[in-house]
Amino acid sequence: RMLSPQVPLLRFAHIDGEHSYDGVYSDLQLAQRYLAPGGLIVLDDIFNMNSACCTHALFDYLRDHPLVHCVAMGYRKAYLCESRWLGFYRKFFLETPDLLGAAGIHVRLCFNAWANERSYVTFDDCGADEPHYQIIGRRFHTLKETLGTLDHAS
């Protein structure tokens, strides 16, 4: 409360702090408290075997705060936003392979469920000639083809 008048709202918060369960959970609470509308929280060391508490705290935090969603995971980071901004960030992450590909950085975006609108996406490196999209093991070369497959599965 003492900080509230002095601390500006954050559009982007990257958490890479003390890696205990309580420390991570507290950092998430603090980041959300000062997050500007439309802001993004990025939590480091997700699924890192040396920092398992980060992943545990993340999933508990998401369970306890239903208006916060994980929109994407990749490179040991989780990307969180408020539910009302989920569509905005999903659109951004869907375009990530094309945006980064133009710069010579190749990533594969993976849909982790057939229910496109309810799932977070994950991403990781891939080769320039490899498919840049995937739905539970099935790979696709274009976003249009991927979304078409998801539409037919619904």
What is each PLM-predicted segment?
Residues R1-S51:
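Active-site segment flanking the S-adenosylmethionine/decSAM binding pocket
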Residues A52-S154:
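Rossmann-like AdoMet/SAM-dependent catalytic core
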